[in-house]
A protein has these predicted regions:
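Glycine-rich ThDP/TPP pyrophosphate-binding loop and its adjacent helix/strand module
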Residues: 1-122
Length: 122
C-alpha cells in the first residue's frame, strides 16, 4: 500500500530493501517466486534498482540517483541492496539452519569495509 500511494501521488520516497537472502530461518529462494524483489516495484510504476549492498560506493550512487529523482518531483524509487546476513535473526539465534563456515567465508570475501578500503572513490 505505501508504494502504491507513493507512486500515485509521486511522493519523494526512497524504499530500500536489504536483501539478505533469508526470511527469518528460511532461505529467500524457497519463499518467493521472483529472484529480484525489486521486480515487484514495476507493478506500481516505480523504478526498481538492484545494487551490490556490500559495495559502499554502489549503494551511495544508487541512493544519490534516487534522491535526485525525488527532489525533481519524479516520485519514488525502490532500491534492492543485495547483501548477506552475517549474524542470526535474533540475539542468541543458534543458526542451526545454515552452514556457519559458509557464512564466515562469504563475510571474509565480501566484507564491505575491506572492499571500501581496497577501492578508491571514483
Amino acid at each position: 500500500k505505501p508504494m502504491n500511494v507513493a507512486s500515485a501521488w509521486k511522493l519523494p520516497v526512497i524504499f530500500v530493501n536489504e536483501m539478505n537472502c533469508w526470511a527469518s530461518t528460511t532461505p529467500y529462494r524457497t519463499t518467493c517466486n521472483v529472484e529480484n524483489i525489486s521486480d515487484r516495484a514495476a507493478g506500481y510504476h516505480v523504478p526498481g534498482v538492484i545494487v551490490d549492498g556490500q559495495d559502499v560506493f554502489a549503494v551511495y550512487e544508487a541512493a544519490k540517483e534516487a534522491v535526485a529523482r525525488a527532489r525533481a518531483g519524479e516520485g519514488p524509487t525502490f532500491i534492492e541492496a543485495k547483501t548477506y546476513r552475517i549474524e542470526g535473526h535474533f540475539v542468541g539465534d543458534p543458526e542451526l539452519y545454515r552452514d556457519h563456515a559458509e557464512t564466515q567465508k562469504i563475510y571474509h570475501d565480501t566484507d564491505p569495509l575491506k572492499m571500501f578500503r581496497a577501492k578508491p572513490p571514483s
